[in-house]
């Protein structure tokens, strides 16, 4: 689905990511973890073609270039960390139809998609609600719904559990686990990563220091501490130094 080959990116003379090589297969759910400044957001921007570096990026067999950029972006949905930046129309319904209509779908087909996604997520009651009158958890779920309405093949999520209470956080986790799309989740919430991801890529200062089975990496206390992180909360107290 996505392949990076020796990808590097710098701001001026300051390298942000260096010689990254990895691939994500169709249907995988991958966690992208690392301390602040590790390069997580940069990788997502590179995948969306928002910035360009050196090396090769291929999405579903398409090289990342100007000619393919529009098609690549239609394949990838991006759930932002701050839902207020994603839900910019007056109502949930208006936000959900914005993408499909701009892709040229008919009003009837768009309506079917919206109703199908809302039913899939159990959010029918939000359809005509005003965005400023719904809770933070409802808005996060509505933001996911707007992306699903565009039927992407892959979904990028930036800190999807941030600022949610335990009930809404669990709702988001359960939703992520039900989605069939390929998913890349960048988060500091390692408990959520443990609950949702089969694989983890651990970054430090723009380089991959571990890439493998999620539970093995997230149980490795020394590895995490060496890279300025702690064990998932659910595992603390059960590991020996």
Question: How does the language model describe each region?
Answer:
Residues 207-230:
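Conserved beta-strand-loop-alpha-helix hinge in the C-terminal portion
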Residues 155-158:
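Catalytic Walker B motif of ABC-type/P-loop ATPase nucleotide-binding domains
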Residues 187-188:
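H-loop/switch region of ABC-family ATPase nucleotide-binding domains
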Residues 33-35:
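The feature captures the beta-strand-to-loop junction immediately N-terminal to the Walker
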Residues 193-195:
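A short, surface-exposed alpha-helical micro-motif characterized by mixed small hydrophobic
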Residues 53-64, 72:
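Conserved ABC transporter NBD signature motif
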Residues 108-126:
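Conserved ABC ATPase "signature" region
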């Amino acid at each position: 689905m996505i392949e990076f080959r020796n990808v590097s990116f710098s701001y001026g003379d300051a390298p942000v990511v260096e010689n990254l090589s990895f691939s994500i297969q169709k249907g995988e759910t991958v966690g992208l973890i690392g301390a602040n400044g590790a390069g997580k957001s940069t990788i997502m921007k590179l995948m969306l073609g928002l910035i360009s570096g050196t090396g090769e990026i291929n999405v579903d067999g398409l090289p990342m270039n100007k000619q393919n950029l529009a098609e690549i972006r239609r394949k990838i949905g991006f759930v932002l960390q701050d839902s207020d930046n994603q839900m910019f129309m007056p109502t949930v319904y208006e936000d959900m139809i914005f993408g499909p209509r701009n892709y040229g779908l008919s009003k009837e087909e768009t309506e079917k998609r919206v109703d199908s996604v809302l039913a899939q997520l159990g959010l029918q009651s939000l359809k005509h609600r005003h965005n400023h009158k719904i809770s933070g958890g409802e808005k996060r779920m509505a933001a996911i719904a707007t992306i699903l309405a565009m039927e992407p093949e892959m979904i990028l999520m930036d800190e999807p559990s941030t600022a949610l209470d335990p009930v809404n956080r669990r709702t988001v986790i359960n939703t992520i686990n039900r989605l069939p799309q390929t998913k890349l989740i960048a988060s500091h919430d390692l408990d959520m990563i443990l609950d949702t991801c089969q694989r983890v890529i651990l970054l430090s200062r723009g380089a991959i220091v571990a890439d493998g089975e999620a539970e093995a990496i997230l149980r490795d206390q020394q590895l995490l501490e060496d890279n300025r992180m702690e064990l998932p909360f659910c595992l603390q107290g059960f590991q020996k130094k």
